[in-house]
Amino acid sequence: MLSGGTSTTSSNQQSVFAKFSNVEFYHVGQAYRLGRYPIHFHMNGDMPTSYVKECAIHESFNRATNMHATNYVTIEANVIYNIMGGAYFLEDGIEIGNVFKNNLAVFVKTSSSLLNEDITPGN
């Protein structure tokens, strides 16, 4: 799922949001393709009402959750298993206010075909 576009209006109200709860994502993500992740928040800015909660992401060929220039999203109580590349990934390191709480990631594998960060996803 890709979430993109402008996320706030001039009145400071969020116009784009994504809410995933109790969803199973299986055999997702396109291997060896940057930007093709199961859940990808892409340059949305502030998204304080958005979340990924109590979901299962497994057998992913390209990461699990990816935040790119997106702020204030809650990632909570998710289980991620058998993932290639970074499981919970903040792409630029400028993302702020995102909450990662009570998540589990098991069997996260390296992927030399993505970014250097995906070679050692536990670092």
Annotated model-derived regions:
Residues 1-13, 41:
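Extracellular beta-strand-rich solenoid/capping regions of secreted or surface-exposed proteins
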Residues 10, 62-65, 90:
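A general structural-boundary detector
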Residues 15, 20-30, 52, 56-58, ...:
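Beta-rich extracellular carbohydrate-active architectures
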Residues 25-50, 86, 90-123:
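Acidic/polar low-complexity surface segments
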Residues 38-44, 48-54, 59, 67, ...:
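Extracellular beta-sheet-rich ligand-binding/adhesion modules
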